[in-house]
């Protein structure tokens, strides 16, 4: 029991090792086996410290090690930039500001206020909108998560009864991409902020820019809200729902997809 408890104390070490390797593009450069010296020279890193990191990743079975050579395996292959199934940005998403906010959790529990806002002086999504690189990285992460998490959604919901489906706050379009793959005849419409929409490169879906706190265009007989409402307080979540209902035709359908707790 004590050992199980003690293991909790250092769980973040593994994540920090993996996310640091992602941040430094280490996995991208280990398609072929290399020594720590070779990789350090290639990426302008400190050889001694890099060797410690590579050994840690090998012990965690994230890298394969043969003699003094390290090479990525099937796990770390998923943390490379150009892999179609990549989780690199999903991994990086929980670093930096997220970690800092978690370290301030006691403030939130004590005051009932946002630990993120206490540190950064603004709500999380305002912070993203003021930092374009962070915004792009965030939506890349959400896209990578959604490609996995919503892979079976078109099997669970019969979208064939709709001529059109609009994803509200759909980021880079992963949900619609999954729907379109199974129901190619459906008109798929992505609605998100203009600065998000301009980065979307899926040719098979229509893209509309705007805010779900304002008017949502009446262009679809079905609307999907996937993991949107939990990001907002009750007042703003109610406004999103109100605007979504107003955007639907009389017999339209609203699909709300959320992770639900017991209460």
Language-model region placement:
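Conserved Class I S-adenosyl-L-methionine-dependent methyltransferase catalytic core
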Residues: 2-29, 41-42, 48-163
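Alpha-helical subdomain
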Residues: 1-59, 64-65, 75, 159, ...
């Amino acid at each position: 029991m004590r050992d199980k408890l003690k293991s909790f104390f250092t769980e973040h070490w593994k994540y920090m090792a993996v996310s640091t390797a992602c941040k430094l593009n280490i996995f991208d450069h280990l398609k072929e086996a290399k020594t720590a010296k070779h990789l350090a020279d290639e990426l302008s890193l400190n050889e001694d410290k890099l060797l410690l990191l590579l050994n840690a990743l090998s012990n965690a079975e994230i890298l394969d090690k043969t003699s003094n050579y390290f090479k990525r395996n099937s796990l770390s292959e998923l943390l490379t930039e150009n892999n179609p199934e990549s989780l690199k940005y999903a991994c990086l998403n929980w670093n930096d500001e997220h970690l800092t906010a978690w370290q301030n959790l006691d403030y939130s529990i004590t005051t009932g206020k946002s630990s993120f806002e206490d540190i950064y002086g603004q709500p999380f999504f305002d912070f993203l909108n003021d930092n374009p690189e962070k915004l792009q990285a965030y939506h890349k992460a959400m896209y990578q998560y959604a490609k996995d998490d919503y892979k079976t959604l078109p099997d669970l919901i019969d979208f064939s009864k709709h001529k059109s489906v609009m994803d509200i706050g759909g980021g880079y379009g992963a949900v619609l991409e999954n729907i379109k793959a199974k129901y190619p005849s459906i008109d798929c419409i992505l609605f998100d902020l203009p600065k998000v929409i301009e980065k979307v490169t899926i040719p098979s879906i229509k893209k509309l820019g705007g805010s779900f706190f304002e008017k949502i265009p009446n262009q679809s007989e079905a609307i999907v809200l996937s993991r949107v409402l939990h990001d907002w307080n009750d007042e703003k979540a109610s406004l999103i729902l109100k605007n979504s209902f107003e955007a639907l035709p009389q017999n339209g359908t609203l699909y709300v997809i959320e992770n639900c707790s017991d209460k």
